[in-house]
Amino acid sequence: MHEKLIREINGEIADALLARKMPFAPSRKAALALLKVPGWTEGLEQMLPIRGRLECAHVLELCSCVLPRLAPRPEEGWLAFCTQYARERMYPGQGFAPDREEYEAGALFFLTVLQVMLDRERRAVPFDPLKDFQFLSSEEMGEYECGEEYRRFLAAFREEYVYEMMRLSEETTPFRTLGHIAGVHYIAMTVARGIREAGENVDLALVSAAAAAHDLGKFGCRPGERVPLLHYYYTDQWLLGRGMPAVSHIAANHSTWDLELDTLSMESLCLIYADFRSKQGRDEQGRETTILYPLEESFHIILRKLENVDQAKRRRYEFVYGKLHDFEDYMRSLGGRRPDRAAGGAEAPQGPGPDAPGRDGGQPDPAVGRAQPEADAPAEQRAEVRQHHRGRPLGQELAAAAGLSGCVRRVLHLSVRAAEDPGPGLPL
């Protein structure tokens, strides 16, 4: 029924395996031969067409007919092992996957198939700001001083299966770090684009890479280590080890506790502002979830959590909130401008075009370049995203805030809750 589509996907998987120089796939012919084992085509047929978010466990079921030919099954299971294996690739020597050599061939095969299938998912379902990334196109990143570091970031993000690891982590751990990171990237980039469109100077490549990397250090923390303190260090190490000092300077210094907000760059402010507004809580079933709050609401949530802390810490957060409120006022002042040309005389950028890369710089992202990516999707798919702004769907707000000033204004009071299986009683 989906013969052509299956051939296309098999070809993409074979090309990906060959590009990574897998020892078990020395040629495209050998890679395709792996996908001819009994059960593969039938399993892929059951997954097509893709109409919703894929589960890593379902992709593992697809791979179950191939994996025994490559490696024995890890004691903890393939999903848990591959989560730790990907962390070990990011942070060698941390002991996340001590038996990696025995299972490496199977892990690489599964992670590559998962990457291809998630690329397909991204093109099939509406954009979700708590799961997806809209990265800059090759043409766009070349405009910025940090463009070369940005290319290195996108390459590492894909080569080390960073996105796939975060999706796996959602199914193998109780944590939902992806939602927070993606949400921060969404807010930071919306703010940065609006500021640039208003004629101010901001490096979008630097903002994008720093926002997408700012909490990756959490995956480098070993059991027993203090994640709130050490994740800055591991973020710094991951970025510096891949030749991204400028990105590291922004990403690893986003704590609001020890920074002098009066001396921060525009890129740092975009990240700290976005991070302040992206909070993790619990839904009615007790599951961790990410919510993007308006600034004032986020501040009051923080204050409630700080009821039992000393006055010095409380005053620090009040100071930070005041500075970020000033930043919002600054953005509102920019919202009144409608320049024909951006800073430096160049035409004001209108956002990435339809051929811009997806969340990892791979396949083009069909949602990029639209004012509201969900607007063209069927109603039942749009409902999955569950974006709201002061009680109204975000799409209505974006329509009301069209134009250059809208890009600045539309994010100021944005409130987004996770769409992933929210449960029947979760208030939106």
Regions inferred by a protein language model and the residue ranges of each:
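Divalent metal-dependent phosphate-bond-processing catalytic cores, especially two-metal-ion Mg2+/Mn2+ enzymes
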Residues: 2-152, 172-202, 213, 223, ...
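Short alpha-helical hairpin
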Residues: 147-167
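His-Asp-centered metal-binding catalytic motifs of divalent-metal-dependent phosphohydrolases/nucleases
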Residues: 184, 202-242, 248-258, 275
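Intrinsic-disorder-associated, low-complexity terminal segments enriched in Asp/Asn/His/Tyr and depleted
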Residues: 365, 376, 388-389, 413, ...
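Short linear motifs in low-complexity or flexible loops
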Residues: 367, 371-379, 383, 400-402, ...
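Periodic, rod-like helical contexts
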Residues: 374, 383-387, 391-399, 407, ...
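Polybasic, low-complexity intrinsically disordered segments
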Residues: 403-418
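Non-Sec secretion/translocation targeting segments of pathogen effectors
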Residues: 426-428
